[in-house]
Amino acid sequence: MDRLEAMAMLVEAVDSGSLSAVSRKMNVPLPTVSRKIADLESHLGTRLLIRSTRKLVLTDAGAAYVSVAKRILEQVAEAERTAAGEYSAPRGDLSVTAPIVFGRLHVLPVVTDFLARYPEINIRLMLSDRNVHLIEEHVDMAIRLGTLPDSSITATRLGEVRHVVCASPSFLAAHGVPETPNSLVMLPCISHDFLAAPRPAWPFRKPGTKVEIVAPVRVRLAVTTAEAAVDAAIAGVGVARLISYQVAEAVARGALQIILAQYEPEPMPVSMLHAGQGILPLKVRSFLDFAAPRLRAAMAAERLNPGREAR
């Protein structure tokens, strides 16, 4: 029995969710796929998969085996790439994901410079505000905001961003500057989260402490993107809660003013992630080494000019 082949079939079955998908992808008859996985289970003396008409479910032994098998297959692939000379020069396709506005403002300029430097690398840049699963969606690198619970992901810290509350000068002149988060319930607010609770509220922090406080807000306008929320706030529709980089340009030119800064929650870390451990493919290592210092510099420059708080 070719254990590496059977191992690869098992991992692909777990990733794709069916033996039929393995058969199509690996161009192997379905009975062969089923037999090889059964032979692997027989060799190991334990059940790895529970098969049903709808889905495949890993047993506890199967989950432990697949976790190790993925690392083994990655190491074999790395060894083959090294022997084939891939590591002599960066080349190939690279998939990168980032939040929409952060990606447009900061990642895209880095990507364009990187492509000019490395003509044999192609990049697929996915801009999305959802947390893309690196392994399941075959993504090489991700820019992620917030804490990182998954220990199988390797992170490089880039900096941090803030959740800020802001409004236009004309809106504040007409309605007054709120002095506490609880004042927001009296003002029209802008939300760009359609999944908000029926009684929306924004989190804040008690000044000088780490104690979180939650203030109810009255949402007058709900939109689907941060850009639309920024535009609506500039137009004077209401108060918006956004991430600092999303409003940095508008604040810097005076179109928006930050309020309640002393109540802001703890800043969120920004990290660059890649899956797996050990030796990185040269295309991934090259992008990490190229992008990380440039993104750190861009975020530092943005922090130096945050605009002034309304008073």
Which functions belong to the PLM regions below?
Residues 67, 245-253, 263-311:
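C-terminal effector-binding regulatory domain of bacterial HTH transcription factors
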Residues 41-58, 256:
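A short LG(V/I)-centered, amphipathic sequence patch enriched
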Residues 188-210:
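Secondary-structure junction motif
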Residues 152-163, 167-192:
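Flexible hinge/capping segments at coil-to-helix
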Residues 214-258, 265, 274, 288:
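Hydrophobic hinge/microswitch elements
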Residues 7, 43-44, 65-87, 301:
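Alpha-helical linker/hinge and terminal dimerization helices associated
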Residues 92-155, 304-311:
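Central regulatory/effector-binding core of bacterial HTH transcription factors
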Residues 12-27:
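Short helix-boundary/capping micro-motifs
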